[in-house]
Design a protein with these regions (language model features):
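Non-catalytic C-terminal interaction segments of nucleic acid-processing enzymes
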Residues: 1-6, 122-197
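Surface-exposed cleft-lining segments at the edges of enzyme active sites
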Residues: 25, 72-80
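A structural signal for short, well-ordered beta-strand segments and their strand-loop junctions
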Residues: 51, 104-106, 143-146
């Protein structure tokens, strides 16, 4: 299925860290902007997957088309939590318009949330979906996918990290703040082998 293929790709992403770049939040070491762009480069590299698709008056993060017909829609929830409800509503409306489409929503694990100072973790997204079930049709059709990497001490820990502070010392702004999405995307594409297992 399209989702299964996307999940395999997501499992190959390396978490781009830059330790001690946020003095006011020592637990944080990941830019949510960089992580979002990493998802974009990884998923859109797959066959039949497209990013930033305009549907009606809204835009979805990713869509998979088979024989020219949209059959899977994916939203990535890494960043502010304020857009979660609107993304859920968007997915439900797409399901109403295209009953055969499948839906997924990717959110970080609780551990990743702490590291990138993002809005909602996958567990919290699942709770919100249950809260909205009585008032929104098609909410039950949304598959929640948790994005996670091994923690310290677990096998594969270092393989799933890319330390920008060590590997790209002159590109701190790309790992922290001050760079545009286009600049970050171009940087990831140029250094693709460093960001994927």
């Amino acid at each position: 299925s399209p989702l299964r293929l996307a999940l395999r790709r997501i499992e190959l992403l390396k978490l781009p860290i830059y330790p001690n770049a946020w003095p006011k939040n020592p637990a944080r070491e990941v830019s949510s902007v960089l992580l979002n762009e990493l998802f974009y480069v990884g998923i859109t590299a797959m066959r039949n997957w497209t990013g930033e698709i305009e549907i009606g008056r809204g835009r979805i993060d990713f869509g998979h088309a088979s024989r020219g017909k949209l059959d899977h829609v994916m939203e990535i929830e890494i960043g502010g939590s304020s857009r979660l409800d609107s993304d859920i509503l968007k997915l439900c409306m797409i399901k109403r318009e295209i009953p055969t489409v499948t839906l997924s929503l990717v959110a970080p694990s609780r551990a990743i949330k702490k590291r990138c100072h993002t809005g909602k973790c996958a567990e919290e997204v699942s709770v919100r979906l249950r809260e909205l079930e009585p008032v929104l049709d098609n909410v039950r059709d949304i598959i929640v996918v948790e994005f996670d990497v091994p923690t310290k001490g677990i096998s594969g820990y270092t393989n799933h990290l890319i330390n920008g502070k060590n590997r790209f010392k002159n590109d701190k702004q790309l790992f922290t703040r001050g760079a545009t999405k286009r600049e970050i995307r171009k940087f990831i594409e140029k250094n693709r082998k460093s960001f994927f297992i």
